[in-house]
Design a protein with these regions (language model features):
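Amphipathic, Lys/Arg-enriched alpha-helical "gate/interface" segment within cytosolic domains
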Residues: 1-132
């Protein structure tokens, strides 16, 4: 588990989920450190689902978006992760940010947007069952 004033990340074994919760706005190292810790958990627990609670979300600075697209997403793909879930309210103040990330993430991952952890998990499990 990782926890800072900006984020909390944990592996939930029963669900095979790396759960990343943003607590408040973070940029540069305060943003990247929790994301790297999530990545390490995803490397350790191959083929896990990645769920990001973005209800306390924020607009990323340009440098963090570039870092995410150029470093994080290619590394995430190597972990075997196939599903990325966003926990968000029906209407979010960061729609543009989520749309930007979703467009890039969907190139390699199934994106699920829902209002709860359980809703994402159910949808992810249904999708994986239907792919068999």
């Amino acid at each position: 588990m990782f926890e800072s004033e900006f984020a909390r990340t944990e592996y939930i074994e029963k669900d095979r989920v790396v759960f990343h919760i943003w607590k408040k706005e973070a940029h540069f190292d305060d943003y990247r450190k929790p994301v790297i810790d999530s990545l390490e958990m995803l490397r350790e627990h191959k083929n896990s689902i990645f769920i990001v609670d973005a209800r306390n979300g924020f607009e990323d600075v340009k440098e963090d978006v570039e870092w995410g697209f150029d470093y994080f997403l290619p590394e995430l793909k190597k972990t075997g992760c196939k599903v990325w879930g966003f926990i968000l309210p029906v209407v979010s103040d960061i729609e543009g940010e989520i749309d930007l990330w979703t467009a890039e993430i969907e190139k390699n991952f199934r994106v699920i947007r829902a209002e709860s952890y359980d809703e994402i998990l159910k949808t992810a499990n249904d999708c994986m069952f239907n792919e068999r």
